[in-house]
Every structure is written in structure tokens, then in C-alpha cells.
Amino acid sequence: MSVYTYEDLSVGKIGYVEKTITESDVNAYTGLTGDFNWLHVDEIRAKQRRFKARIVHGMFLAGLISNVVGNLMPGPGTCYVNQNMKFLKPCYINDTIKAQAEVVEKLPRG
């Protein structure tokens, strides 16, 4: 795991993590957040609907970027304050997701 200082960062630098989302991940997230929406927890009902299976919570997926920013790039001590996203496709249990951050601008320190 690489940790970058401000000086190490440059426009175009990319950091990412990949994670295969498991049944246990979805169950843990459901329990922690209280989001028991049937889309995430009821396989029988979900099979009859648009996605044809349970889907992973979108906010669980969005949270993966915290791993990238807080642990990889720039790394420990980093606190990000904004995140914009658009969910283009559903994520299913056992899908592998890549959460990626790229430096698009580097402002002067201070």
C-alpha cells in the first residue's frame, strides 16, 4: 500500500482498490445502516423485479472511495469533503468493483 505526500501527488496520478462484494458485506451494511429495502435483502421479491436479483446498496459502493482516499491517495490523515456520483448499472453480490481516484488538479499549498 503506497502512501503519498503532497509533493508526491501530480495531475494524472491514480489510486484504486478492487473489492468483490460478498453476501456478508451486504448483510453487515444492512445491519449497520438499518437499510432493509427489499431490493437488497429479499432475493425472491428482487428476482421478480427490474434487476432480477438483489442489488448492493449504492451508498456501500460509494463508501469504497473512502478506502482509496483515506488509505492510498493521498492516504492517512486525509479527509475528503465532497463526492458526486451517478450509478450507471446495478452491482450484484459477488461482483468485483473498482473504486478509483485521480488527481485532476493540484492547488498550491496554504
Q: Where are the regions a protein language model picked out?
A:
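Hydrophobic beta-sheet segments that form the core/acyl-binding groove
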Residues: 81-110
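Hot-dog-fold acyl-thioester-processing enzymes
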Residues: 1-79
